[in-house]
Structures are given as C-alpha cells and as structure tokens.
Amino acid sequence: MMIDLNADLGEGGANDSALLQLVSSANIACGFHAGDAGLMVQSVREALKYGVAVGAHPGYPDRENFGRTAMDLPPETVYAQMLYQIGALAAIVQAQGGELQHVKPHGMLYNQAAKSPPLADAIARAIRDVNPKLVLVGLAGSELIRAGQHYGLTTRQEVFADRGYLADGSLVPRSQPGALIDSEEQALAQTLEMVQHHRVRSISGEWANVVAQTVCLHGDGPHALDFARRLRAAFAGRHILVSAQLDAEA
C-alpha cells in the first residue's frame, strides 16, 4: 500500500524545512493568501533539495484572514486568479530546474470548491489550461474531484489527519466545535482508519466513506513535527510506503 503525505508550505511557518524531510509533497503558497516571490523561490529550492514533489497552493486574495474567509467571486475571476498563481509558481519551479507536479487550492477556496460545481469547474479548467498533466488535489469525494475528472485531470483525493468530519464526508467548518483534533492519539487513529479502511467516524458518530490517496499534515501546530514522525513510523510499521508517485490515482 502507498500513500502520499502533503503539507502546506511557504506560508511563513517555522517548521517548513523540517517538514520537508517528512512529507512526499509540498503545496507552496502563491502570494495571494500568504507568501511572496522570495519565499516561493526559497520554498521551491528546499523542496527540490529534499526530493519532494512541488505543488501550487493558490488561494483567495485575502492575506488579512489567511484565505479563510468566504468570498463570492465570479467563476471567471477565480479562473484568472488560478492562472496567475499557478503560472507564477510553475515558472519558479522551472527556473530552479524542477517541474510543477500538482495543484491544491487553499483554505476557503478549497472548502467552497468542494461543494460548488461552478467554482470547482473554474479551478479544474484553469489547471487543465495551464498544464493538463498537473494533478488536482481536492477533498475526497468532493465537487472539486468530480470537476477534475470531468476535464480529464489526474486527481488525488485528500484526507486530513487533524480535522473533524461531518456525516457527509465534508470537513467540520473551523468556526464550529469539533473542527480540529487536538489529541495526537485520536488524529493518528483517524488517519490509519482512513488510509487502511477508507472510512472516518464523523463528529455525530456515523461512519463516512472516504478515498484516501494523500494525507494533509498541518505544520503550524506546536506538536506538528512530533506527530508527523509518529505517523511516518506508524505507516512504516504497517508496510505503508509514503510516496508522491502513487500506483493508481482517480
């Protein structure tokens, strides 16, 4: 069995360099919700140094709220913003001798696209128009995954180690109780359940089916690195190989 481990980087976090030695994919902020040109170059160089797959992490133009506030933008505006952000990072990766591998939207853009077909369509279409070989990373079972499949993109269905789930397989909004899992033991158990048995227990107690092809590790918590190491050890003990090159993707 294989699984991809990804982390959102280039957002000013202190753990970026250490996380790059534990994950297989890096999603690098493209300057809208966080990061800037210099940090993008630095992050790409470090990711390539450690042999980590580099992806774009485009978000809403909302630095004040870290891209976590809902916005009601026309799909064509979102399409243009995706071209701008993905294209910028792709150029930086190419200039550093690498190749952009995937795209994972950030924050509220990611969450809204999970449930909004027009928004998901704009994002998937932009990715296809930049490079149809790019992998689209989205919430497992979401509209974003369906849009990517519609446009012929390779998709990678994502689950979250430290986020609570609703009965429909969507994430508990950050504004609600149960959105974040503070217990490392609970997060570890949830991740293994999703990866090995393709299901997650929702905050209401029901099981929701999920397809786990990549696991997101949030690197901004006080115990983020310890948890990442524990998760890697748990995978190794169960003969689960961590790699960005999955055998079969959706």
Curated annotation (Swiss-Prot):
Molecular-function GO terms, alphabetical: 5-oxoprolinase (ATP-hydrolyzing) activity; ATP binding
Enzyme class of the recorded protein, top EC level: hydrolase
Family (UniProt): Belongs to the LamB/PxpA family.
InterPro entries cross-referenced by the UniProt entry: Glyco_hydro/deAcase_b/a-brl, LamB/YcsF/PxpA-like
EC numbers: 3.5.2.9
Reactions catalysed, as given in the entry: 5-oxo-L-proline + ATP + 2 H2O = L-glutamate + ADP + phosphate + H(+)
Quaternary context: Forms a complex composed of PxpA, PxpB and PxpC.
Lineage start: Bacteria, Pseudomonadati, Pseudomonadota, Gammaproteobacteria, Enterobacterales
Protein name, as recorded: 5-oxoprolinase subunit A
Gene: pxpA
TM helices/strands, residue ranges: none
PANTHER family per the UniProt record, alphabetical: 5-OXOPROLINASE SUBUNIT A, UNCHARACTERIZED PROTEIN YBGL-RELATED
Pfam families: LamB_YcsF
